[in-house]
Amino acid sequence: MNRGKSGGRFGIVDVGSNSVRLVLYERGSRAPATLFNEKVLAGLGEGLSEEGRLSDESKERALAAIRRFLVIAQSADARSLTIVATVAARVAVNGPDFIADIEKITGVPVRVLDGREEAEMAAYGVLCGFWRPDGVVGDLGGGSLELIDIGDDRLGAGESYGLGTLRLKNDSRGSLGDAATI
C-alpha cells in the first residue's frame, strides 16, 4: 500500500482520545463515496488527566483495532492509507512510543495533528460535503473541542479547547455537578 497515489480507494485512520476509526473512500469527486466506516472505542484518553500517560490496556485496544483496520484496508485494495492522531497521543508522556508502535505495525508515518489542524480537518469535511457553507464548525472528541469559522469556501480562525467527553468525565470524577461547573 502506498501513500499519496491519486485515484482509487484510500483509507484514513483517526486515532482519537476515545476511539480509533477507519474510513475507506472511493475517490472521484469533491465528496468521495464512503465504502467502509468503523469505530472502536479504545479510551486512550481515559485517566490521561491524572496520569499523563496512555494506559497499557487502552494502547492494546487501539493497536488491535489498527492491526485489524490495516487488514481491512489491504483487503479492500486501498491504494493509500493516512493515519492521524490527536490530543491524547500528542500530550501523553508515552505518546511518542505509542506512535512509533503504530508506525512499526503499519509501515505508515503517523501525522500527529495540533489543535489548529484538528479544527481544519473538521472544516474540510464540511467544505467537502456542503455547497458554500457559512458558520462555525464544531468537533467534540474525547479529549478536546475544536471550533473553526468557515465561509466563502475559506477557513477562518480555529481553536482547540481542552474539553472533550473523556476529559470532562475524568476531571469531574463522574459527578454531574462537577461536570456542570467545569
Regions found by a protein language model. Name each.
Residues 142-144:
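Active-site-adjacent helix-turn-beta-strand microarchitecture at beta-sheet edges
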Residues 1-17, 23-137, 148-182:
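Nucleotide/phosphate-binding catalytic cleft detector across ATP-hydrolyzing
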